[in-house]
Amino acid sequence: MPTTIPEALRLLRTFWTGPDWPFAPPAAAATLERLRQHVGRPLPPPLEAYVQLAAPTQPLVLEQVGNPLTLYALDELSLVQPGYSHDARTGQPLPGWPATWLLLGDIGGDPVVLDVAAPGEAVSQYYHGEGSWASGTPLANSVGQLLLCAAAMHHALTGIVPGQPALATAAGGQLLLAPAAAAWLQPRLRAWAGPYAEDWAGPLANALPPPPLRKPRLP
């Protein structure tokens, strides 16, 4: 299960089909220095690697089932995010938002967060409109894993059967990937997402390999 940015980028290059390669910041030094000053301590090495090697220079929309994941552009990465950490009108800090949370992006407005003071913790999605940020859903054990899994879902939904619907609803109401997309995604999502695979699969009934059949016990 890859957890580093270089390993995630190596695997991304094996399937990324976009017209441009968006994961190559041309000049990250200013962003790194700005973040270091905000944090007041050395940045976690995985975050430094993301900023230097992979943060997109423009907001990057990665399609998922439901709302897409929007990764914020390099110059948008900050501990100060209007509407989340601070009031967008007054600029005053909002209560309840941890000062060490860095927004990597959002899913339909739900923030995807890395805690710069606890880099060993999971990258998690939290939910706006619930009155607090007390609980969220872990998505990945690192920024590299988040990037890889989100890009894999995006590719399965947009890059396997271009020009054709990637999703269908079965007779029983199950949401299914197109067969070719499911065949591509199943082994990769299980291997790359590890314990977070079910969260990435979401409502897709065929995003993961079926469980192995149990052999009947002999009498």
Regions found by a protein language model. Give the residues of each.
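Residues in well-ordered beta-strands of folded domains
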Residues: 105, 115, 124-126
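Short helix/loop capping segments that flank catalytic or ligand/cofactor-binding pockets
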Residues: 112-115, 134-136
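Short, flexible loop/turn elements at secondary-structure junctions
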Residues: 105-108, 118, 130
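A surface-exposed partner-binding patch
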Residues: 1-111, 164-166, 171, 176-219
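Compact, glycine/acidic-enriched structural inserts
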Residues: 124-159
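Helix N-cap / beta->alpha transition motif
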Residues: 70-73, 115, 141-142
